[in-house]
């Protein structure tokens, strides 16, 4: 049975009010199983909101605390993940919120509390399509069976803009990378831009630990010397990309 739900969220941080329709979910894969493929490399059934934000001077802790607090007005208040910058691009946090299979922006909104208005220096908001929430949570290690065991996970967050005429090649490559024999990731997600920022694909790779991340980097460096290796192939198809290492602060 489907229901129509209106989400009214905080406009300043891009949690725009949306109307969405969502149905019953499919059973989750077995917990702890190694993901066979990148979630979202093929079928993308659901809409997500991606919010990158830079904290105002001296407000990083307050902003993080606010971002990781579930919005009680949302019908799916726990359908989000918050990642915190450790090394890489200029943003401090990224919040990825699941909206369901459909979303529409409405004019009505909720006023931002006065004490929250100055927490962010800047932000960007982008709607993307991606895998089901079940696939997403499995890949990111935040499903009910895993999230208490994956608090030490490391997430590499990357976004890409393909060179003109190379969109399909880049998308294919991003979906293939986790299948490499020396890959140490525990889960991968690929999402595609619908509306918002100037990138086309968002990829998130999860590692169980910093040791696993380091091992993956050590394994991949020799590949940069190969003409057909991932390092060179990426630069055959990409106009722009950034990579940022993060940890998870919610859930």
Task: Outline where the language-model segments fall.
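Short S/T/G/P-rich N-terminal loop/turn motif that feeds into the first structured element of a domain
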Residues: 23-251
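Short stretches within intrinsically disordered, low-complexity N-terminal or propeptide regions
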Residues: 11-13, 35
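Bacterial N-terminal signal peptides that target proteins for export
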Residues: 1-9, 18
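C-terminal segment of classical bacterial N-terminal signal peptides
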Residues: 14-22
């Amino acid at each position: 049975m489907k229901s129509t739900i209106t989400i009214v969220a905080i406009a300043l941080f891009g949690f725009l009010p949306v109307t969405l329709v969502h149905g019953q979910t499919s059973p989750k894969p077995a917990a702890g199983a190694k993901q066979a493929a990148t979630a979202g490399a093929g079928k993308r059934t659901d809409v997500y909101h991606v919010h990158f934000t830079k904290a105002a001077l001296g407000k990083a802790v307050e902003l993080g605390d606010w971002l990781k607090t579930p919005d009680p007005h949302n019908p799916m208040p726990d359908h989000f993940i918050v990642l915190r910058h450790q090394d890489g691009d200029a943003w401090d946090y990224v919040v990825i919120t699941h909206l369901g299979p459909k979303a529409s922006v409405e004019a009505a909104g909720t006023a931002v509390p006065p004490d929250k208005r100055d927490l962010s220096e800047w932000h960007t908001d982008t709607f993307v399509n991606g895998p089901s929430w079940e696939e997403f949570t499995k890949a990111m290690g935040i499903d009910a069976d895993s999230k208490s065991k994956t608090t030490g996970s490391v997430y590499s967050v990357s976004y890409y803009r393909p060179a003109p005429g190379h969109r399909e090649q880049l998308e294919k490559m991003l979906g293939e990378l986790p299948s490499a024999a020396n890959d140490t990731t525990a889960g991968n997600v690929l999402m595609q831009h619908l509306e918002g920022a100037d990138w086309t694909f968002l990829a998130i790779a999860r590692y169980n630990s910093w040791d696993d991340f380091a091992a993956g980097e050590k394994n991949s460096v020799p590949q940069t010397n190969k003409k057909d290796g991932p390092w060179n192939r990426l630069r055959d198809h990409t106009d722009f990309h950034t990579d940022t290492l993060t940890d998870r602060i919610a859930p």
